[in-house]
Amino acid sequence: MTDIFRRAWNWCCRFRHRCGYGVHSPSDFHFITFVIYERLPFYAYTPLHRLRRGVLHLPHYREKVDRLLFRVVNERRPSALLEVGTGSGLSALYMASANQQMKVRTLDQKYQEKVARLFGENSRITYEKCELKDGIEHFLSENHCPDLIHIAHTPCYKEVFDLLLPKVKSETCMIIGQPYATAEKKQWWKEVVADERTGVTFDLYDVGLVFFDKSRVKEHRIVNFL
């Protein structure tokens, strides 16, 4: 119940930030209108919805957020995703379903059999239990920095961000999970937004999106996605 009241309060606070009002950048307006607020029912939503019940006891986002991540991948078409903090595995599965050519590496400090079964025989998803720092460094030693990074269900978000930030490219999109989860994380999110090394950022409350195209004017977009 507390979460419902908190969301209602934040929805009111973000009321004027709905539907791209006041956004003058054509690319940002397109992203808000046709990715964030897109309502068309994608083909994969129904089978993915059926898989949710079996892993909802593990850390996860609302279904609305997982569908957003699906649309982000569908729009940007990244070739690779690195996810840190697998949680229920639902977000990785949604994003993998949006691009059949994208390879996914998802790292967690705990291995869950139900998550492994959720991924099933999908050869494009690699699910790895590891110390996160070691797993990230090993990944980067074998691969270029991926086009899409998801810092998800992990208490080590600061360390993960600091490890990956020097490796990002102008095409990289970084998804920050639950930037308002704690007072400490909220303050850190403000620092990420203000950091001169980051570019355009989007605050959707449940997730933050960070882009690194330095040819763009640095701006911060608050979007009412509650």
Question: How does the language model describe each region?
Answer:
Residues M1-H150, T154-S170, Y180-L226:
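A short alpha-helical cap/connector motif
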